[in-house]
Amino acid sequence: MRLSREARARLYGPTVGDRIRLADTNLILEVEEDWTLPPGEEAVFGGGKTVRDGMAQSQRSRSEGAPDLVITNAVVLDWWGVVKADVGVRDGRIVALGKAGNPDIMDGVTPGLEIGPGTEVISGQGRILTPGGIDVHIHFIAPQQAWEALFSGITTMTGGGTGPSEGTKATTCTPGPWYIHRMLEALEGLPLNFGLLGKGNASSPQALEEQILAGAIGLKIHEDWGATPAVIDTALTVAEAYDVQVAIHTDTLNESGFVEDTLAAFKGRTIHTFHSEGAGGGHAPDILRVVGYPNVLPSSTNPTMPYTVNTLDEHLDMLMVCHHLSPNIPEDVAFAESRIRPETMAAEDVLHDLGAISMMTSDSQAMGRVGEVILRTWQTAHKMKEERGPLPQDSTRNDNFRIRRYLAKYTINPAIAHGIAEYVGSIEPGKYADLVLWHPAFFGVKPDLVLKAGFIVATPMGDPNASIPTPEPVRYRPMFAAFGKALTRVSFTFVSQAALERGGLPAGLNRTLLPVRKTRGLTKKDMRLNDALPQVEVDPETYRVLVDGEEITSEPAKILPLAQRYFLF
């Protein structure tokens, strides 16, 4: 019996050469390899299907190596490629990608994917599997942020804060050991991975060291606490000693120096620059220059992404609220206005498309939207293809390289930058199975299924009193991985290695504690598919942006995909 490509795609999902449009964007994904081949013995669950006893299900017990979960026939999209594969999970970690089934009667079954009676199945055919998103610029203002992020496909959040205090609404810091401990305790009840940044603003090391020893995974320098060269040098010196990252919001007012002085204070040491365009804060008007330095790992925050006809209008009020400014004080208004430049906003989109800005983050409730990191990343990719055409690495058939570049901005690159890439950030054996399944029509905007360590944590679910799962009202709802002791088994807390070794953490934490590592000595070249180092200049009078001597800009978008069409109900 022979199947047409169309019939095979309907039954088993796309294979090599099949192409998928991502939601209502202009982005086309093409399957590059099919690891479930040869055809004819696909693992498919359901009535009359193959995953049955003696067929694609073997007699292997868990003790004999059968996986706990197999996701079948998914299109795996990650920074490293686009493949059709079955994915196996055991003990919460990915064990293999390849062909699942029963090796007693099937050829080519991948070791680790031998389906047994103890194996659960999630059907991935016709769906796209990506790593869970990682948002590393979180103001922990409200615990409800976690649900908004989770329901958008984010599974890891790092940042700082203590709730809706003035300090937290403006800065991404959890200051001092007492608050770090209380926040570590509070975050135990939310079903995502978390890590906390301590306050990095000090000219002497002792107060910074005690925060790292209390569990902080890094330090945040913020201009509202004083981002002076002395502060920068001290924070980076401490970070080098303890192998943690430093994130910085630089000095918008140029009070203690200009961008050149800040770059000099880095002394070539690795640092993560938040909202590198500057509307979120940073040396006016030319903080954007930092994206051309090899020791700088730059990110954007999502309110400026992508640049639209509405971007300018909303920023002034946002800024006044977030930074405790008064519209009645002329100096406060001037401070706010100095950060809002359409020219640098327009250039930011292009710098992302060139791979010069490596990460995308939210800046949650502090000039950013926690549930829109993924959505705005793909809106930007769409806008750039619309304006700039295919990337040189792509063809007229697909946008695979551009898609992988943009995916890396909220998955593997923030994981690398903050020392958690050995645990999360990509779909590779050995990493935790923090995964998101998407129907192509809803890709990037509404996930189909979110897993934490291989356990379903969230999904659109119909009326719980209905006879089947699908009747309206269909809403995002937490699933079993979000409850009871299971939550603490499949969601992890990142802490410093020093805190684990020296016993500086609060007693009674129930979650698995994982140390951050390998944050120092990173360079832009470690940012997957986003390692460009252009020379960037900003004209101090006109704010025009030059990249390697050529002016770059983009038009404000009037219409975007992944917008009202998906939020009518």
Swiss-Prot record:
<feature type="binding site">
    <location>
        <position position="222"/>
    </location>
    <ligand>
        <name>substrate</name>
    </ligand>
</feature>
<dbReference type="InterPro" id="IPR006680">
    <property type="entry name" value="Amidohydro-rel"/>
</dbReference>
<keyword id="KW-0378">Hydrolase</keyword>
<dbReference type="InterPro" id="IPR050112">
    <property type="entry name" value="Urease_alpha_subunit"/>
</dbReference>
<feature type="binding site">
    <location>
        <position position="249"/>
    </location>
    <ligand>
        <name>Ni(2+) 2</name>
    </ligand>
</feature>
<comment type="subunit">
    <text>Heterotrimer of UreA (gamma), UreB (beta) and UreC (alpha) subunits. Three heterotrimers associate to form the active enzyme.</text>
</comment>
<dbReference type="InterPro" id="IPR011059">
    <property type="entry name" value="Metal-dep_hydrolase_composite"/>
</dbReference>
<dbReference type="InterPro" id="IPR017950">
    <property type="entry name" value="Urease_AS"/>
</dbReference>
<keyword id="KW-0533">Nickel</keyword>
<dbReference type="GO" id="GO:0005737">
    <property type="term" value="C:cytoplasm"/>
</dbReference>
<feature type="binding site" description="via carbamate group">
    <location>
        <position position="220"/>
    </location>
    <ligand>
        <name>Ni(2+) 1</name>
    </ligand>
</feature>
<dbReference type="GO" id="GO:0016151">
    <property type="term" value="F:nickel cation binding"/>
</dbReference>
<feature type="binding site">
    <location>
        <position position="363"/>
    </location>
    <ligand>
        <name>Ni(2+) 1</name>
    </ligand>
</feature>
<keyword id="KW-0963">Cytoplasm</keyword>
<dbReference type="InterPro" id="IPR017951">
    <property type="entry name" value="Urease_asu_c"/>
</dbReference>
<feature type="modified residue" description="N6-carboxylysine">
    <location>
        <position position="220"/>
    </location>
</feature>
<comment type="pathway">
    <text>Nitrogen metabolism; urea degradation; CO(2) and NH(3) from urea (urease route): step 1/1.</text>
</comment>
<feature type="domain" description="Urease">
    <location>
        <begin position="132"/>
        <end position="569"/>
    </location>
</feature>
<comment type="similarity">
    <text>Belongs to the metallo-dependent hydrolases superfamily. Urease alpha subunit family.</text>
</comment>
<feature type="binding site">
    <location>
        <position position="275"/>
    </location>
    <ligand>
        <name>Ni(2+) 2</name>
    </ligand>
</feature>
<dbReference type="Pfam" id="PF01979">
    <property type="entry name" value="Amidohydro_1"/>
</dbReference>
<keyword id="KW-0479">Metal-binding</keyword>
<dbReference type="InterPro" id="IPR005848">
    <property type="entry name" value="Urease_asu"/>
</dbReference>
<dbReference type="Pfam" id="PF00449">
    <property type="entry name" value="Urease_alpha"/>
</dbReference>
<feature type="binding site">
    <location>
        <position position="139"/>
    </location>
    <ligand>
        <name>Ni(2+) 1</name>
    </ligand>
</feature>
<feature type="active site" description="Proton donor">
    <location>
        <position position="323"/>
    </location>
</feature>
<dbReference type="InterPro" id="IPR032466">
    <property type="entry name" value="Metal_Hydrolase"/>
</dbReference>
<dbReference type="GO" id="GO:0009039">
    <property type="term" value="F:urease activity"/>
</dbReference>
<protein>
    <recommendedName>
        <fullName>Urease subunit alpha</fullName>
        <ecNumber>3.5.1.5</ecNumber>
    </recommendedName>
</protein>
<dbReference type="InterPro" id="IPR011612">
    <property type="entry name" value="Urease_alpha_N_dom"/>
</dbReference>
<feature type="binding site">
    <location>
        <position position="137"/>
    </location>
    <ligand>
        <name>Ni(2+) 1</name>
    </ligand>
</feature>
<feature type="binding site" description="via carbamate group">
    <location>
        <position position="220"/>
    </location>
    <ligand>
        <name>Ni(2+) 2</name>
    </ligand>
</feature>
<dbReference type="GO" id="GO:0043419">
    <property type="term" value="P:urea catabolic process"/>
</dbReference>
